[in-house]
Amino acid sequence: MAASSALRLILGSSSASRRQILSEMGYQFTLLSADIDEKAIRKEKPEELVVALAHAKADAILEKMQNNGMMKEIVDSQDTTLLITADQVVVHDGVIREKPSTPEEAREFIKGYSESHAATIGSVLVTNVKTGVRRDGWDKAEVYFHKIPDKVVESLIEEGNVFYVAGGLLVEHPLTSPLVEAIVGTIDSVMGLPKALTETLIKESFSEP
């Protein structure tokens, strides 16, 4: 489904890779960020955690829209407005990893990917703003790396992008992409917005409440 004047999309994310993927899918969209305390939400299973976080982000953005007048504009409009929120964690050796908070943590995370594979668990939630219909799902992918040299690890930490992604896992970066041995799943899932799942949820969000 291509973007049209009757469909308005809001991407509730500050992630550059999610913006890139949604653009690749042929959609035009506006951006709003949730600004929530992600560490305040805890779940034992990674699948439950990422779905809960996507819902929390949607709640925060809808409240923001209510306060700034966007919600009234949407309700009065003939257009369908969909809000897309997403979250992702990395699971490595059975441990859930979110964004690294220190250089030491980032170093430990990235070096670990030389020893055993990482799994990405990513959620997508599409909220039909006018009807309140919500459709969510999650997707999983696995990433296998060759040995990541210490020099690459230090360059990534110095550059800083690793602190903005789950598990400090960057597969599309020029320094790390040559070191990826295999991906089981899709690259867009690893990057935080699985295209097939997103398309499915967009279609489903048009259903009756």
Report the location of each language-model feature.
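NAD(P)+-binding Rossmann beta1-loop-alpha1 motif at the extreme N-terminus of oxidoreductases
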Residues: 9, 16-28
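Cofactor-binding loop segments of dinucleotide-utilizing enzymes, especially the Rossmann-like FAD-
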Residues: 14, 34, 129
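Generic detector of contiguous secondary-structure segments
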Residues: 13-16, 41-44
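Anionic-ligand binding patches
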Residues: 2-10, 23, 47-209
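Short glycine-rich, Thr/Ser-proximal phosphate-binding strand/loop in the N-terminal lobe
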Residues: 26-43, 134-140
